[in-house]
UniProtKB/Swiss-Prot annotation:
Claim: Zinc is one of the keywords in the record: no
Subcellular location: Cytoplasm
Name the record gives this protein: Cold shock protein CspA
GO biological process entries: negative regulation of termination of DNA-templated transcription; positive regulation of DNA-templated transcription; regulation of gene expression; response to cold
SMART domains to which the protein is assigned, alphabetical: CSP
Broad class of where this protein is predominantly found: cytoplasm
Molecular function (Gene Ontology), one example: RNA binding
Keyword terms of this UniProt record: Activator, Cytoplasm, DNA-binding, Stress response, Transcription, Transcription regulation
Amino acid sequence: MSGKMTGIVKWFNADKGFGFITPDDGSKDVFVHFSAIQNDGYKSLDEGQKVSFTIESGAKGPAAGNVTSL
């Protein structure tokens, strides 16, 4: 849907496995599911963490995909 974007993790609930990323370009916050995180091992994000991601078409609207830590 679009190229790589960068943003900051607004919040992430590790127990439920999802959260939101605030894009650096000022666009609307993007839903992120743990399955989109490209880390080895435990897939979680920290509040305030800088990440890069793509926008995918999720079941309930736009969602982050290919999420990697910067």
